[in-house]
Amino acid sequence: MVRLINKKNIKYVSWGIYKLLKLQEMMTYLRNVDYPDVKQCIYVMWHSNQFVVHGFRDKNKTSILISNSLDGDIVSYVAQKWGFKVKRGSSGRKGAISATKQLHDELMVGENIAIMVDGPRGPYHEVKKGAIILSIETGVPIVPVNWYSEDKSFKEINSWDKMKFPLGRCRIMNIYGKPIYPENKTEEELTAEVKNTLLELEKISPQKYKQAEKEGLWKNR
């Protein structure tokens, strides 16, 4: 079977998807809740919530790790159009080492980074070590992020990561956890704290969403 996306048409496909996302952006009302008051951080999210990055206020000083694949080429194109810096890496050992070094260098010059901690292929909701090691090595805090909506236009697709995204007019909330600092914590302790915080954000999101509705968070569209 011929793959619909290939090296010959990847530029056109990327451009087309970006234009579709721009159209969706006009119908999406994304609001930030509990945005972190930190100068620098490592944003982390589940792979299913990768579009949370669109709500970040500091896109131009944030690097995103994206896989070296054709699908990654599309994501990379869109991310750069949105104003992010992009670092590419693979799930193999050499690719992971190269990607970690690139992100480490960005942190050392005061930039932020964003990592999907159970990507690129899972296991589902299992935090991998990349963000954890970078936080311990640099001292930069980790900020977990979740996104949530109760609108019917907020869809979940049948994929390994249960990806969520808006399709039509949609009110969405980005909810941020408190910064997690690595001092005096082992890899295992920090990993557990990050995972538990991400799961807790998912748990409290419905309550936060209802509270935001009462406070009129989406009145000024």
Regions found by a protein language model. Give the residues of each.
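Membrane-anchoring hydrophobic helices of lipid-metabolizing enzymes
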Residues: 1-52, 58, 101, 169, ...
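Catalytic-site beta-strand/loop segments enriched in glycine and acidic/polar residues
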Residues: 104-138
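A cross-family acyltransferase "interaction/gating" segment
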Residues: 129-185
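Amphipathic coiled-coil/heptad-repeat helices and related helical stalk/stem segments
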Residues: 46, 96-100, 127-128
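Catalytic core of membrane glycerolipid acyltransferases/transacylases, capturing the structured
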Residues: 39-94, 138, 153-154
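Cofactor-binding loop segments of dinucleotide-utilizing enzymes, especially the Rossmann-like FAD-
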Residues: 67-69, 118, 147-150
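Short, charged beta->alpha transition segments
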Residues: 72-76, 98-105
